Amino acid sequence: MYDYHQPDLAGHFGIYGGSFVSETLTHAINELKDAYARYQNDPKFLAEFNYELKHFVGRPSPIYHAARMSREQGGAQIYLKREDLNHTGAHKINNTIGQAMLARRMGKQRIIAETGAGQHGVATATICARYGLECVVYMGSEDVKRQSPNVYRMNLLGATVVPVESGSKTLKDALNEAMRDWVANVDNTFYIIGTVAGPHPYPMMVRDFQSVIGTECLSQMPEMNAGRQPDAVVACVGGGSNAMGIFHPYIAHENTRLIGVEAAGEGLDSGKHSASLQRGLPGVLHGNRTYVLQNDDGQVTETHSISAGLDYPGVGPEHAYLKDIGRAEYVGITDTEALQAFHYLCRTEGIIPALESAHAVAYAMKLAKTMRSDQSILVNLSGRGDKDIGTVADLSGADFYDRPSMRGLGVKGGVATSPESFDASGAKGAGSQS
């Protein structure tokens, strides 16, 4: 069993983490650290948090045995932790509830957040609506285009969505703008960061709120898996909050492999990916030291992923630490492989996953073939794919207009063909990229 106690009092996970912020934010960070230290083990705070998780979110989320997929892939049995069934459709709500509760106790009435895929923005807007808090969400304009359903959901919930036009117009830039807002409005504003990154105490705090995922799995998996824990836990990694939420309770279980799946984009050697743990170097980004995709001059480089939620040049510092000590492994899945897994899960199990989650599903499908049938893989299905339908339709060349029902037929570019002419990606001749 691992003896694991991280971070230290200064928020360091080995050489990673810490708090690198402007002088303007030092007081706000210290105020947040003090508040979290006060409430993180407070019985009333925890009772309210658990009440919200049960009655508002709908926890515990179930574990589902993907039996048909397991049979077709061969090898290990594949199980899915169904975070997609949470209220708002992803794991993000676990964290936003905890931080919003903390904000109320600190007397903050204005909430800001950053979002990539839009799920954290929706979760933040949702809890702000529930608690009657002002909500402003920063989102890269590129992500606004590819995640438009979530933008409208945020508007319906009363949030102001601010498109960010700087840089690559994605998650990194949204986080930069949110930080600027916090500096300008520090007295009345609470920043709900959506991932296990940022200055201390955010990586620890977000991990703690998300650890409900793995804690539930510890009791659920033996019921599903003949009394045993999984041989491997697989989760997608952008900033890394869903992965850390399921990994952390399993760190002490050294017979369970922890595997994080990064966005390999067009290939790890293409320069068009978001795989900071595999191609990055240690550096400081958004208030913490971690692995960062950067050039020889230390400038943060542009990233790419089919998935807006994984399109980020850094990663949570605890993931960096787990990589260095060898407790977790990190691999890459390309856009094409993720898209194939997206279609395959839809058609095999009747579950539409988020494109982020599809990266984890894709790797689990590969991994299962290398394992025995009496072994098991637990995949964190971090979110549902409603938000990605437009992106997937565009990439598949689907045309939803001016045609009769195509039930039972494959569709590409509005032309019906037999299902046999399509592979698991839903596109003729599509193959995985190396």
UniProtKB/Swiss-Prot annotation:
PANTHER family: TRYPTOPHAN SYNTHASE, TRYPTOPHAN SYNTHASE-RELATED. This is Tryptophan synthase beta chain. It catalyses: (1S,2R)-1-C-(indol-3-yl)glycerol 3-phosphate + L-serine = D-glyceraldehyde 3-phosphate + L-tryptophan + H2O. The modification N6-(pyridoxal phosphate)lysine is found at K92. The lineage of its organism: Bacteria, Pseudomonadati, Pseudomonadota, Betaproteobacteria, Burkholderiales. Belongs to the TrpB family. Pfam families: PALP. Keywords: Amino-acid biosynthesis, Aromatic amino acid biosynthesis, Lyase, Pyridoxal phosphate, Tryptophan biosynthesis. Its cofactor is pyridoxal 5'-phosphate. One of its GO terms (molecular function) is tryptophan synthase activity. NCBIfam families: trpB (TIGR00263). Residues 411-434 are annotated as: Disordered. Its EC number is 4.2.1.20. CDD domains: Trp-synth_B. Tetramer of two alpha and two beta chains. It is an enzyme of class 4 (lyase).
